Amino acid sequence: DLKFAFETDAHLAQSYGAIKAAIHTSNFIFIPDEWFDQENLSVYTKFMGSERKIYTKHHDELGFNTLFSLDEKVEEKLPENTVVYPQSSPLLALSGHLSGDALLVDFTATSFNVLFIKDKKITFQNHYEAENAEEFNYFLLLIIEQLGLTESVPVYLQGIINEDDEYYSTLLKYFNNLYFFFPAGKQNSELLADMPKHYFSGLLALDLCE
């Protein structure tokens, strides 16, 4: 239980000045700055699939805003001073660290998050549930077709993926340039000494989120 972990875990239970959490939610939309009305957020409710509280995150350098809502059960389990972000925020924060056209894929144990940059602009971002390599292959083919990707586009990988697993082998069927994307900025965590650095790229990217 998440709430119990925050109360009892030796690391999580400490008194922090600030806590950041990137949380998966299917209730999110992107709104360009010119169409965004901070004073009238209720107008976006019909696009959200939820009538719960709407959170907003402005991406200064990107020119748009993320609007999202969370499951009430999740909100209740987080410490009061938690600053919440949608799962897309760490990838958006890392977009400035990529040069040229690129596909960035962030893996968890049962899902993956995709960001595509073309002509120095974010043109695509989405999140997919994939329980196995077969499901991953299905969604990957959809993405390739939708974005018109070629085998030469650079693909940067982070999260729970390794060179010897089926997900990596699946990517090799369609792309020639695969790279592990390592954490941006300072890295003082002891975790990085014991695990592959790219496992924590998305987590540490939260430090870049405003």
Annotated model-derived regions:
Residues 2-95, 186-187:
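Active-site neighborhood for divalent-cation/phosphate handling
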Residues 13-15, 56-150:
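Small-residue (GG/TT-enriched) beta-loop-alpha framework at ligand/catalytic clefts
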Residues 22, 105, 157-158:
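Short hydrophobic segments within beta-strands
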Residues 26-28, 109-111, 162:
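Gly/Ser/Thr-rich loops at beta-strand to alpha-helix junctions
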Residues 30-32, 125, 166:
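Generic domain-boundary/flexible-linker signal
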Residues 33, 117, 183:
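Surface loops and adjacent helix of pleckstrin homology
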Residues 127-206:
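Accessory, usually C-terminal, subdomains that scaffold auxiliary metal cofactors
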Residues 209-210:
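Short acidic DE-rich linear segments
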